[in-house]
């Protein structure tokens, strides 16, 4: 699918996040996560957001006509950036068929000592047609990600970063959403 086809398919429609913590979760195995995706597909979703290559690949193979937002959460000691933090994860997510790759789009430092949003520019330089979703926490993050070439902005990290905790305590950050 090209960018316009992806946007046309998801515009105004529901994307279902099919994710489970790795530990002690009955939906953790990829087969179970695919069943969760099946329920969402029956309900009419336009696509899925899934974590880890094995889940992304199995769900995409089961539902090739649905849009797949692939992420890979990698936790590194001493580093707050964990959503698809480096090109290594991007390469794998591309290879297994992610239509959209979501990355941390904050201005926090990744495990390589670079601002997380800088990965967007690197992806776009190597793969200009790759649709990139930036998971942001603040309006400033959104601006930086748009300048870096992000195709989609998601408020995924609002309330989860030092820059956004105070706003989250007040409830939904409608200013950020707008």
Locate the predicted segments by residue.
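N-terminal amphipathic alpha-helix/helix-capping segment at the start of soluble metabolic enzymes
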Residues: 1-27
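Glycine-rich phosphate-binding active-site loops on the catalytic face of alpha/beta enzymes
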Residues: 19-21, 42-43, 48, 72-76, ...
């Amino acid at each position: 699918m090209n960018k316009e086809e992806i946007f046309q398919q998801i515009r105004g429609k529901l994307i279902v996040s099919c994710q489970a913590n790795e530990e002690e979760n009955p939906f953790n195995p990829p087969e179970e996560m695919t069943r969760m995706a099946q329920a969402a597909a029956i309900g009419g979703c336009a696509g899925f957001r899934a974590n880890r290559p094995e889940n992304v690949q199995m769900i995409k193979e089961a539902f090739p006509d649905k849009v797949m937002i692939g992420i890979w959460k990698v936790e590194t000691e001493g580093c707050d950036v964990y959503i698809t933090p480096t090109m290594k994860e991007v390469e794998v997510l591309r290879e297994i068929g992610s239509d959209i790759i979501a990355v941390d789009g904050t201005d926090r430092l990744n495990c390589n000592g670079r601002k997380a949003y800088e990965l967007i520019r690197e992806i776009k330089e190597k793969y200009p047609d790759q649709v990139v979703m930036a998971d942001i926490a603040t309006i400033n993050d959104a601006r930086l990600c748009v300048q870096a070439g992000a195709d989609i902005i998601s408020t995924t990290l609002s309330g989860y970063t030092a820059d956004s905790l105070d706003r989250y305590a007040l409830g939904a950050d409608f200013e950020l959403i707008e």
